[in-house]
Each structure stands twice: as C-alpha cells, then as structure tokens.
Amino acid sequence: MKKEERHKVLAIPVTFTEDKPKFLTVRDRRFKEWLFISGGCRKREVLNPIRCALRELEEETRGVVNVKSGLYTSYTFETTDRSPEELEEDRKEGVHVTIVYHVFIFFMKISAHEQQDIVRKFNYEKAKVELRKKDKLPIKRTYDENDFMSFDTLDIFNRKNRWDLIVNKVINNPDFYSALNSLNRKSFNIR
C-alpha cells in the first residue's frame, strides 16, 4: 500500500472580550457539527500553509472575514483518522493517508459590536446564496459549506455538538493552549 501525506489547516481567529478569549466558530451544513475553520491545502500552498488558512477563512465565512495581516501562533499535528467513506476510497486507491494539520491561531481585535456585524454579514451572504439556489442560479460552493457562525468562549463552544477531530486534536491538546497563551507571536502580511 502506497503512503500519502496530505496537508490541511485549521484557522482559529480569537479575540479577547473582557479578557476572555472568544473564538470564531462555524457549523458545518452537512454534518451539523460546530468547528473551527478547516480545509485542505492546494499543492502550491503546502510550503506556505498560512495562505491556505487565510483562503479557507475567507471561503468558509462566505467572504466576510478577509484577513491580510496580523499576528498568529501555530502548531502542527498528524492523524490517520479518516471517515468510513474516506477509508473506503483510500482502500480502492491503494493508499494509506496521513493528514498533516497546520493549526493557526489568529489574534484579532474585534469588539462585541463588530462580532455581531460579522455574524450579520455572514447571515446576509447566506440568504443571498439561498435565494440563488432557489432561483436555480450558480453559486460558489466553497461559500456554502457552513450554515451558522458564532463568536464563542470555549465554555459555550464545548456545550455544542462539535466535530470529534476538534475535540480530540485541538480542545484536548496542550499544544493548543500553549499556542493560545504564547507571547511569541509571529506577524504576517499577505498581499
């Protein structure tokens, strides 16, 4: 069996409201699970996964969150966990897949009012897509992966139905808290 490595990202915008971290979270339309922004890297993005994270952040927020510069911390983890459908596909292709996840925590200053405005814009964009679907017009499928967006504390996020990978590899991972609390932040400026 051939071994294959694929690269994915988790983009986790965080803002501190009243000294408590609030995370931008979305709910996956298909599986009804809450998660951080996630997606696969294109071949040209593998060597610079922050570009992938920023692209996914824009796509999965329906174009509402488009970040070009700021501060971040990051870490990586690997997993061979795959869905039953993916495992069946891997078996047919004769590959054993390892996924390398690049986790980026983006530190942002977003007031409570701005958070509400971002969610409102997301809902407006969602309504526009629903109208286009109803009228049988083309839509950007990448902008239609998530049906809800929220800024949540971890306490609130942990009460929701979450994707197992987020729980096991992020929320329960000490590397996440090290990155979140690190003052050794890197800057980025993508044009």
Regions found by a protein language model. Name each.
Residues M1-F23, R42, H102:
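Conserved N-terminal beta-strand and adjoining loop/helix that marks the start
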Residues R30-W34, E114-R191:
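Nudix hydrolase/Nudix homology domain
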Residues E4-R6, E18, F36, H96-V100, ...:
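A generic fold-level signal
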Residues K32-E33, I37-G39, K43, R82-T98, ...:
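Functional cleft and adjacent loop/helix regions within the main domain
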Residues H7, T76-K134, F148-D155, K169:
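Active-site-adjacent beta-strand/loop module that shapes the phosphate/pyrophosphate-binding cleft
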Residues K20-N66:
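Conserved Nudix-box catalytic region and its N-terminal flanking loop in Nudix hydrolases
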Residues H7-A11, P49, D147:
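Residue-level detector of short, conserved catalytic/binding motifs and their immediate flanks
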